[in-house]
Amino acid sequence: MSARVLMVQGCTSDAGKSTLVAALCRWLHRQGIAVAPFKPQNMALNSAVTVDGGEIGRAQALQAQACGLEPQTDFNPVLLKPNSDTGAQVIVHGHPVATLDAVGYHAYKATAFNAVLASHARLVERFDVVLVEGAGSPAEINLRDNDIANMGYAEAVDCAVILVADIDRGGVFAHLVGTLALLSASERARVAGVVINRFRGDLALLQPGLAWLERETGKPVLGVLPYLHGLQLDAEDAVPRNAPQEPQSQLRVVVPVLPRISNHTDVDALLAHPQVDVRLIGPGQTPPPCDLILLPGSKSTRHDLQWLRTHGWDAAIARHLRYGGKLLGICGGLQMLGTHLHDPRGIEGAAGSSPGLGWLSLQTTLQPHKQLHRVHGRLLLGDASVSGYEIHCALSSGAALARPLLQLDDGRTDGAISDDGQVLGTYVHGVFDHPMHWLHCWRGPVWRRPRHWILPRCAKPAWSVWPMRCTRIWIPRH
């Protein structure tokens, strides 16, 4: 079997590529078509653990769920996780191979592309359709040489491309016309059509612009997708721009937006909860009174620990606990809660040690080998079942671990609870993705909006406006 391959590229970052691919994956899966997602190269700090013990971008894990599949490393063969302004950890087929700066990665691209093509070859043999997501924009002139994420990949495998633009941010016609103008003749020829995303208002008022666009570019407008309010899907990098503010909140959560924040998708289920008010606090902002301070993961924990101190979070946390508040650290956040954090090999930056915040009696040493596990177990606070995943390069030890937060099904324990029950920590990401009975131990009721409810919601409008002429490009005959 050899699959039909369609690639979705965007005029900009955050144009809606991930959501559109997830929506189409869901629709095709419901038609009984064997479909798989694919992203050749992803740059993201939010990642997920696969069934084969690797690491891929969260968007591809969500798209896999839309296809009725477990996440697999072939869905995202190259993942770049920035750990500074100029460098990133390079993950190939789910496992770290190097930490490189931009020049070093440019030299490594040929090797990375071989990994991309190997994953592509396996997927097209297993599935009827492979839906591919590009990265950023295909028109970044400085990144076009040896490109493996957008048109470089499309040219190599000879697939059709659909170009998506976000009308909500403005300039949609300039984005589309300009992007097409910056492509080579062969690249432009493989663009099958364009899609306008996040439209609000009367479609009739847009029609003259669509007619002009088709005349100007020679490309059909394949669809105009509506703006979907309250769509809580996993983000890859940016912290969500709009956190709900619920005047009737029964749980108030504050999250510091760390400079190197990683896997901030841990708060997504809280953002979707109608009675949880999540406040994302950046530099220069004063943390408001709350029930829970959540310290998220970090790709550079010692750097972000110093950032917390510089911005007065150590004093804010002490005041919060003094008045009976709760404090939870996840992964890097757990490490910050200990007494010391050691990085003798320079895994996350300059080698050295840093004092922790000191709220849990444990210390952590960073190690070269990354721990990647999907886990199931029970929360020892409230006796609720949990599932999630571990992604870290650390070994923690100390008296606090004698009172763990989780009992895992593989016999291990995880995390810690302080003697007074106010301070908690865990290495398991995704603890809020499943029924949140344990939050009831602190405040308020249990509720979540599961992804299997959200995915059909984004799939329906994506397909309802998708002309049937598009299906003839790539859907296999039965």
From Swiss-Prot:
Pfam families named among the record's database cross-references: CbiA, GATase_3
GO molecular function: ABC-type vitamin B12 transporter activity; catalytic activity
Active site feature: 331, 429
Pathway: Cofactor biosynthesis; adenosylcobalamin biosynthesis
Keywords attached to this entry: Cobalamin biosynthesis, Glutamine amidotransferase
PROSITE patterns referenced in this protein's UniProt entry, alphabetically: GATASE_COBBQ (PS51274)
CDD domains documented for this protein: CobQ_N (cd05389), GATase1_CobQ (cd01750)
The organism's place on the tree of life at top rank: Bacteria
GATase cobBQ-type domain segment(s): 250-437
Gene Ontology biological process terms in this record: cobalamin biosynthetic process
InterPro entries: Class_I_gatase-like, CobQ/CobB/MinD/ParA_Nub-bd_dom, CobQ_GATase1, CobQ_N, CobQ_synth, GATase_3, P-loop_NTPase
NCBIfam families assigned: cobQ, PRK00784.1
Family: Belongs to the CobB/CobQ family. CobQ subfamily.
Functional description taken from the UniProt entry: Catalyzes amidations at positions B, D, E, and G on adenosylcobyrinic A,C-diamide. NH(2) groups are provided by glutamine, and one molecule of ATP is hydrogenolyzed for each amidation.
Name of the protein: Cobyric acid synthase
Organism: Xanthomonas euvesicatoria pv. vesicatoria (strain 85-10)
Gene that produces this protein: cobQ
